[in-house]
């Protein structure tokens, strides 16, 4: 420390060392006295301290090397700067992370907000759909109740119709009335319907006497072979009977019993089955019977036209006088007016009634012969039925 000297005598190396006052003036031992109370330089009250190794660090720092002190200070300052920088960097790093988290949270909440809006729209649509479905369910329930009520009504109607049809079926099985109006005849024909509990109906023709005559009573083969020699062309009964039998599913060879062909045909037409017939079988049977009667009407019409061409038109006005009535006849007589609406069969029967008694009896006798329908005989040079199967 070459700069230390006595500020009064300027002695640089005193033997007893130096003193430093509280006003930072240095004095040697010679100049400074132990009882020095006033500074010799600035004249202030001072307190003296010996400069030796026991001085305090506060005083010692003034005698240290300034470069070293600066270096130490710089090092300390650098440490302070480093500490502060590291602390600052740590804070900045934390704030940066928080900022990134904030940005991510903003993106997240923005996305969730969009999803929330979408879910809210879907919820509104689902609510509307539920309301519509509830309305449809209520309407469907009403329709179901209505349909059940209609089904119950239909079942009740069906039950009543079934009971009615069952009653009609029982009535038909018990007795089937003859639907044709009967012409007046001299002789009382047998009963039109003869039935019993264990047999089918036996329909008898009103124009044919039953039982039939013996096959040997008349040569009916020669009658058809040379019919014009004995009498005018008669009724085309063969075509009519075979048409009725073929329509009802019967063969011409079936007429081998004692009953006449006309009786067999009427029996097949109007005899219902003793079994319990269903609605479908009844309808089919009615349709078949109607077809048979239509074909029978056509056969009678052909006979009437043939007879009109051969002998002239029959005078219908003489119907009541052409046949004897017979006072004891139990058959009801139906008088037909010329302008009244009648069925084709009734018209044909009225035309057929124009024959005299002898001709009608002859027709009855011929048509009741066994095997009459099995033979194919031409009448007036024409054949009205096909060959027998």
Curated annotation (Swiss-Prot):
Tissue-specific expression: Expressed througout the gonad (at protein level). Expressed in the germline.
Keyword annotations of the record: Chromosome, Coiled coil, DNA recombination, Meiosis, Metal-binding, Zinc, Zinc-finger
Compartment(s) where it occurs, according to its Swiss-Prot or TrEMBL record: Chromosome
Protein origin, superkingdom: Eukaryota
Region of interest: Disordered: 366-389
InterPro entries xref list: Zip3/RNF212-like, Znf_RING, Znf_RING_CS
Chief localization: nucleus
Zn finger intervals (RING-type): 6-43
GO biological process per UniProt: chiasma assembly; embryo development ending in birth or egg hatching; homologous chromosome pairing at meiosis; meiotic chromosome segregation; reciprocal meiotic recombination; synaptonemal complex disassembly
Effect the entry attributes to changing residue 25 to A: In vv137; 3% embryonic lethality and 3% of surviving progeny are male. Does not abolish zhp-4 recruitment to the synaptonemal complex between homologous chromosome pairs during pachytene
Coiled-coil intervals, chain numbering: 123-164
Disruption outcome: High levels of embryonic lethality, but a small proportion of the surviving progeny develop beyond the L3 larval stage. Of the surviving progeny, there is a high incidence of males (him phenotype). Impaired meiotic recombination with no chiasma formation between homologous chromosome pairs at diplotene and diakinesis. This is most likely due to an absence of crossover recombination. Disrupted rad-51 localization during meiosis, whereby rad-51-positive foci are present in the gonad similarly to wild-type, however unlike in wild-type, they disappear before the end of pachytene.
Entry GO CC: chromosome; synaptonemal complex
GO molecular function per UniProt: SUMO transferase activity; zinc ion binding
Subunit structure: Interacts with zhp-4; the interaction is required for their localization along paired chromosomes and stability, and for the formation of chiasma during meiotic recombination.
PANTHER family from the UniProt entry: RING FINGER PROTEIN NARYA-RELATED, ZIP HOMOLOGOUS PROTEIN 3
General function of this protein: Recruited co-dependently with zhp-4 to the synaptonemal complex between homologous chromosome pairs to regulate the formation and number of crossover events between homologs during meiotic recombination. In the early stages of pachytene, in complex with zhp-4, recruited by the zhp-1-zhp-2 heterodimer to designated crossover sites along the homolog pair to stabilize other pro-crossover factors such as rmh-1, msh-5 and cosa-1. This in turn facilitates crossover and promotes the formation of chiasma in each meiotic nucleus at the late pachytene stage of meiosis.
UniProt name for this protein: Zip homologous protein 3
